[in-house]
Regions:
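PLD-like (HKD) phosphodiesterase/transphosphatidyltransferase domain
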Residues: 1-62, 138, 183, 187-205
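Short, conserved active-site loop motifs that form the nucleotide-linked donor/cofactor pocket
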Residues: 2, 85-87
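Short beta-strand scaffold segments in enzyme catalytic cores
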Residues: 97-100, 130-132
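Short, aromatic/basic amphipathic alpha-helical patches
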Residues: 71-82
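Short, solvent-exposed loop/turn segments at secondary-structure junctions
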Residues: 31-33, 67-69, 112-114
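Short solvent-exposed loop/turn micro-motifs enriched in small/polar/acidic residues
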Residues: 89-93, 125
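Short glycine-/acidic-enriched loop or helix-start segments at secondary-structure transitions
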Residues: 36-37, 72-74, 117-118
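Signature of lipid phosphatidyltransferase scaffolds
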Residues: 105-202
Length: 205
């Protein structure tokens, strides 16, 4: 399968796949805002979908360039499982938009993780977007390798944009380390997210 994805198909054929992921999901996006998915006659935040995944034991990694807006952060705080289990990093150089589903299918394209990009906004309000949905393993592996290179900080040492980076990926604290060090996790809506890690209080209990 190598399928051209445009406009509303980003919601119907890409975002709709997220709920059925069984093992792993990686998301790369430049911008990140609150977005919603249809549930019966209503809707729910996309974060609720991610919450269900991590509760099932699915590994979810989110890599983004910009700190999310207030609405996103407030929605995040309503899903405690995400605070503990969602893996998230921030790099201001990230401009790719991709999703890799269970290491088997990949979306590579232009749509950010926003309502107008990949969410349920209607025709006439949403962005014009374009991308490819593929199960060609050469492309899937290439996308995953590119994501992982950024995720692991492979480019940090020689990065020329350090003045714009509050905290290099190589120094971002893992959540299991936070728990072991007995730091206090501050709710994300209290202050802005701090460069790819949960805001921390260094007052140990």
């Amino acid at each position: 399968m190598n399928k051209y994805i445009s406009d509303i198909a980003h919601y119907n054929e890409v975002l709709a796949r997220v709920a059925s992921v069984k093992h792993s999901l990686v998301i790369g996006t430049a911008d990140i805002k609150d977005l919603y998915v249809k549930v019966g006659a209503g809707r729910e935040p996309f974060l609720a979908v991610l919450d269900k995944l991590v509760r099932r034991g699915v590994e979810v990694r989110l890599l983004h360039a910009k700190e999310p807006g207030l609405n996103f952060r407030e929605d995040f705080d309503k899903h405690p499982a995400l605070i503990k289990k969602l893996q998230r990093k921030l790099c201001p150089r990230v401009h790719f938009k991709m999703m890799v589903f269970d290491c088997e299918v990949a979306y590579i394209g232009s749509a950010n993780l926003t309502g107008a990009g990949i969410g349920m906004k209607s025709d006439g309000k949403r962005n014009f977007e374009a991308g490819i949905l593929t199960d060609d393993l050469a492309l899937v592996d290439a996308a995953a390798d590119h994501f992982n290179a950024v995720w692991t900080g492979e480019y940090c040492k020689n990065c020329k944009r350090k003045d714009y980076c509050g905290m290099p990926i190589t120094k971002q604290v893992k959540k299991d380390e936070i728990i072991e060090q007995n730091f206090q996790i501050i709710p994300l809506s209290v202050l802005m997210w701090q460069r790819g890690v949960l805001l921390l209080s260094h007052n140990k209990t």
